[in-house]
Amino acid sequence: LPPKLLPGGYVMGLSGYRHPDYGMQDGVNLIEIDYDGNIVWEFDNFENIDDPGRDHRWMARQPHNYQREGNPVGSYVPGMDAKPLSGNTLILVHQTIHNPKISDKKLLDDAMIEVDWDGNILWKWSISEHFDELGFDEAAKNVLFRDPNLRASDGGVGDYLHVNCMSYLGPN
């Protein structure tokens, strides 16, 4: 995922990824750096991870998109400047769950969280908690139950919907 340039020469992006044996596209932490390379903001406290043979640590588990408050698209738009030194951040994350209503297999569940400048999670919206609202008919639910797009990571996990993007809504 490419980093995003913010006003004033600030850059936001991932500092690295979790080992692929244990996670699929799990960003370790989302950081913002200034022009001189100093970290001015960091988020990594979504999930506490203890992978075998690795250091126990907190991770963002951020696979794809993120948006800083003020700019819903992530690139320059006149009058919609992201807030480089303040504001909330919307982050697409995922976590490993067991939900027998969706599948009898382990699942990689996508979610959206909003984090304040201090790294506090203000709210979370998880796909698995709203699965019945997505409008899948019984045939589609049956397919997802039997094969939720299994991946080798994490001992076999179903990447059942694989969300890539989310965004703040701009002015209507």
Task: Give the label of every model feature segment.
Residues L1-N172:
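Histidine-/acidic-rich catalytic cores in large beta-rich domains
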